[in-house]
């Protein structure tokens, strides 16, 4: 049996992570449920009419995109646009992808859109914690330019703190018709651990454990539920994806 020292007030124990996560879940439910419902209805309207919802996220935001498109319990009418495809097609190099260069380049979004069969009845969900990088902002602008609705999943606190890297000077929430705020902090960290890099505990400690991913995934699942509810209300069977690892 391991004898643990009692945690200090700012120590990043698993229990602290659970507590912070619970607060964020409560905040999302209280402040964003109506926005999520609005977004779900807007997307469902397009899907029920035969449209596709295109989902785009870069970096760790792609984890949220993957919760919406191409997974068990999700909807087949949601398709993901991925930067990795630009490496496969030799439009970009693997280094561009790994070092984060691609997500800063507006032309990367343009290249993905050019290669996709986007229709006049489609819609977009663009996910970006910071909301400032060139590719997500360009993706939203290209969709708006085609007259397509855009739902953003982003941190308004972070986005309002930083300048856009897009030539337009716009951030994602300033382009999207509907913006769902994950509530993730500017640092995107949930808890503080020990002394800070420039001083003792008063300096704030080391930020660990991201917020944007688990908050974004919760938003993605809530969006899916809203859309499925719209299908059922319309008397239409939702095009759900089932796990390929089930024996039926």
Please place each PLM-identified region on the residue numbering.
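Residue-level recognition of alpha-helical structural elements
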Residues: 10, 32-36, 237
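Internal alpha/beta core interface subdomains
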Residues: 225-228, 232
């Amino acid at each position: 049996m391991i004898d643990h020292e009692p945690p200090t007030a700012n120590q990043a124990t698993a229990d602290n992570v659970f507590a912070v996560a619970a607060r964020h879940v409560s905040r999302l439910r209280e402040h964003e449920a109506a926005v999520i419902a609005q977004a779900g209805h807007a997307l469902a309207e397009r899907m029920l009419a035969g449209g596709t919802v295109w989902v785009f996220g870069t970096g760790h935001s792609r984890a949220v995109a993957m919760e919406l498109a191409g997974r068990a319990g999700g909807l087949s009418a949601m398709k993901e646009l991925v930067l990795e495809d630009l490496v496969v097609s030799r439009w970009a190099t693997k280094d561009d992808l790994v070092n984060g260069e691609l997500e800063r380049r507006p032309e990367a979004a343009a290249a993905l859109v050019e290669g996709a069969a986007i229709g006049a009845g489609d819609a977009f969900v663009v996910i970006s914690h910071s909301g400032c990088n060139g590719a997500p902002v360009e993706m939203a602008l290209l969709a708006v330019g085609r007259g397509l609705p855009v739902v953003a999943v982003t941190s308004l606190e972070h986005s309002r703190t930083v300048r856009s890297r897009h030539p337009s000077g716009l951030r994602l929430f300033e382009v999207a018709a509907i913006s769902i705020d994950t509530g993730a902090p500017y640092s995107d960290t949930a808890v503080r651990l020990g002394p800070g890099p420039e001083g003792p505990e008063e300096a704030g400690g080391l930020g660990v454990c991201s917020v944007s991913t688990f908050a974004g995934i919760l938003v993605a699942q809530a969006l899916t539920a809203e859309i499925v509810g719209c299908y059922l209300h319309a008397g239409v069977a939702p095009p759900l994806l089932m796990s390929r690892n089930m024996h039926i």
